[in-house]
Amino acid sequence: MILTSVLGSGPRSWSSLWPLLGSSLSLRARSTSATDTHHVELARERSKTVTSFYNQSAIDVAAEKPSVRLTPTMMLYSGRSQDGSHLLKSGRYLQQELPVRIAHRIKGFRSLPFIIGCNPTILHVHELYIRAFQKLTDFPPIKDQADEAQYCQLVRQLLDDHKDVVTLLAEGLRESRKHIQDEKLVRYFLDKTLTSRLGIRMLATHHLALHEDKPDFVGIICTRLSPKKIIEKWVDFARRLCEHKYGNAPRVRINGHVAARFPFIPMPLDYILPELLKNAMRATMESHLDTPYNVPDVVITIANNDIDLIIRISDRGGGIAHKDLDRVMDYHFTTAEASTQDPRINPLFGHLDMHSGGQSGPMHGFGFGLPTSRAYAEYLGGSLQLQSLQGIGTDVYLRLRHIDGREESFRI
């Protein structure tokens, strides 16, 4: 490939290399199929946006600012005001904070090896962030409730524009997998991009939800969350998927602190739980293909204390092979990794791309489910760990720190 031979696959100076993109892609287009030519044209068009804003001083200045992360307690006790001043305060915080966080992600896209950044799908996501930065910084300062209402419309639009970013990143990296030489660099990029996206969506959705008067909720924070109820919701969802795929699904038993209730943010659980449950059910069904209507139960244990919430999901799906155990929490997008048959690494019916509001989007099979869940848990001050009993099954431990516990909570 022309770009590979000229530019290589290592990091380069994007500001000096972007002018080469048009001519390089033109040469490449001569030897590609009609589909590839279409992709080249898309890349050329999208590069115009990236090129025109690449040296924009506003992005550079914002990227040097630190983000101001809030604790859920700050969000919970910021209070409601009769005159709506809490909405103005929240909106002004977002107006200051979102451009900074988005500028950080644009800087992250610049750090990618040039040949990966030229991928049309990756370029499209890069462009989405630049356009979002432009729209947010073009919005005038929020002075009154009318301004805040218009700002909410912009935030809703941007949330919708970015709803497929996880899927697009997975597609782009799989398309670019032969150019990935430093997987640690790409994994760091993904961890930062995906967790930043989660934080942005949580803050934005929280602000929008402050306009609603929903029982037991302050914004996106549920003041009396029941782990058992949210688990049951996603058990029903995962069982329907499993029944559609295999004709049956394991039963699920929930034990432990089933009566626990406490303030918490459901959104991370809405992202993580479907993935873990789907994996457990799939592993169970795949390891009992000879007896699909007589499979072991999946057992979920809830442990609640004054520091954190622990959810253990135990399946009898045969466990994870020793050779795969060290890699199961990694993002899988290379050719060699795509050939594995382990359910958690190369799923037959994909991984969930969860959108804002806790609704499940389309399924995608790029091996992003577990590593994304792990990154989310760590971002929220917790962890996601697996214990495999090869030949028996797997226990998955999800720990999430309380927002009102004895120790300091996480920051969003």
From Swiss-Prot:
Protein name per its UniProtKB record: Branched-chain alpha-ketoacid dehydrogenase kinase
Induction remarks: Expression in female liver is influenced by circadian rhythm.
UniProt-annotated binding residues for ATP: N279, D315, T334, T335, H364, G367, L370
Compartment annotation: Mitochondrion matrix; Mitochondrion
Documented EC number(s): 2.7.11.1, 2.7.11.4
Keywords noted in UniProt: Acetylation, ATP-binding, Kinase, Magnesium, Metal-binding, Mitochondrion, Nucleotide-binding, Phosphoprotein, Potassium, Transferase, Transit peptide
Gene: Bckdk
One example of a Gene Ontology biological process annotation: branched-chain amino acid catabolic process
InterPro entries: AK/P_DHK_N_sf, BCDHK/PDK_N, BCKD/PDK, HATPase_C_sf, His_kinase_dom, Sig_transdc_His_kin-like_C
SMART domains recorded: HATPase_c
Assembly information from the UniProt record: Homodimer. Homotetramer. Dimerizes through interaction of two opposing nucleotide-binding domains. Interacts with E2 component of the branched-chain alpha-ketoacid dehydrogenase (BCKDH) complex. Competes with BCKDK for binding to the E2 component; this interaction is modulated by branched-chain alpha-keto acids. At steady state, BCKDH holoenzyme contains BCKDK and BCKDHA is phosphorylated. In response to high levels of branched-chain alpha-keto acids, the inhibitory BCKDK is replaced by activating PPM1K leading to BCKDHA dephosphorylation and BCAA degradation.
Binding sites annotated in the UniProt record for Mg(2+): N279
Positions of modified residues (Phosphoserine): S31, S52, S356, S360
Tissue-by-tissue expression: Ubiquitous.
Top EC class for this record: transferase
Role: Serine/threonine-protein kinase component of macronutrients metabolism. Forms a functional kinase and phosphatase pair with PPM1K, serving as a metabolic regulatory node that coordinates branched-chain amino acids (BCAAs) with glucose and lipid metabolism via two distinct phosphoprotein targets: mitochondrial BCKDHA subunit of the branched-chain alpha-ketoacid dehydrogenase (BCKDH) complex and cytosolic ACLY, a lipogenic enzyme of Krebs cycle.
Effects seen without this gene: Mutant animals are born at the expected Mendelian ratio, but they exhibit a decreased fertility. They are healthy at birth. At 3 weeks of age, they start showing growth retardation. At 12 weeks, they are 15% smaller than their wild-type littermates. Adults develop neurological abnormalities, such as tremors, epileptic seizures and hindlimb clasping. These neurological deficits can be completely abolished when mice are fed with a diet enriched in branched amino acids.
Binding residues for K(+): V328, D330, F333, G367
